[in-house]
């Protein structure tokens, strides 16, 4: 158990803020006092760069834009009066719109009060809202939230099936910054079809959250959607939770968005302090830097011991990995930076991969997230004069102790309870840590060039699929092997992709592509229409 030495170290390095309701224990990371001294100057430079960023310095040179998600919870920090007023007015419009929906002054086309929200988006545009909606859900919610966040047709059908006859009472939020994101566009078209088949007008149930002047914004204006709320070029998707992207759906659900914003604002204030030991965001980033030694490849296991925080790991996975996973640094040098984030929740994870954490490769550190308040109201005693919440804490403490005994590092974040304020604190804490770590290792945390590569390759795959279908339809009944087909459409170097596309085409009925199985399987032959005898 804890020794006198570890107790002394715990007290020396514990960050505690009673107003935030936040404790950060870094004592089980094996850094030395010399490490902290050696990082004093790099940290001072990081603080300086962050000050410039918050004042509107160009933070994303690739896209020529500022990065201002910190302004969302404190608009008066924004560098221009136009931005200040835009943030404040948008928040007021969000709250006014939510009040109109809740009061019934704004209803669906057939006089149905809106009781549900359907969010359609992808990535950062929906991970954050989904996390907070789940974390703060209660029996007092004013509306029920549903999410379409993937291009899976069956997944979309499942969501629409759960909504069922409530579709006339469902408000649909389409979230896309550019308005051209394929997954979101496809989700919107699928949902539009569902409204049409139900005899409903999609525009009478639709709200756009997008950049002004985007394709989506123009469509919403042309069709007369209920409303359009802005996204700004200085807010990236993964840091957009406290913009209209998250605040609109959360306000509609009935969540305390003022508390959410206040928690983030208050935490931001603490993470601007120049004293690293009194700055929780800096301490967190510094521990990441210590663990990775400023290099890529380390793994962060996130273990929140609270069901309400189960989706927090997925949210952090995108925030951290998309921000920090970079091939090049700001000087254009190849560095392959990144921290791999995974996890689910405790104590479930103790029965899945804890075995490897204790006895497998030592290539990770654990971030425990502890919530002190077990539930609303008293608990029943189980055994050993203990409640289920006391057992849960014991599992956390026991796992942490076992890791320490094996020489495996961990840090622990503790909050008093899960509410809107503490969720805001946690969001701001990790956003700041990401910014500071990126400055320490000299990378751009605010772009995602590799994601664009994937989108481009996906577009090429769609074009190849269309070429395959067009060729087969122009030769009805004639059978082709993969090699013959690839040669005919001049795609010989992509035979594997041709085969994969054909397997999907033959499994689904839309294009009428058939397969004559071969031996081995890749030697199958493919055709459209009845085979030529």
Swiss-Prot record:
Its EC number is 5.3.1.9. One of its GO terms (biological process) is glucose 6-phosphate metabolic process. GO terms for molecular function: carbohydrate derivative binding; glucose-6-phosphate isomerase activity; monosaccharide binding. SUPFAM superfamilies: SIS domain. Its main location: cytoplasm. Pathway: Carbohydrate biosynthesis; gluconeogenesis; Carbohydrate degradation; glycolysis; D-glyceraldehyde 3-phosphate and glycerone phosphate from D-glucose: step 2/4. The active site is at 322 (proton donor), 351, 455. PROSITE patterns: P_GLUCOSE_ISOMERASE_2, P_GLUCOSE_ISOMERASE_3. This is Glucose-6-phosphate isomerase. The gene is pgi.
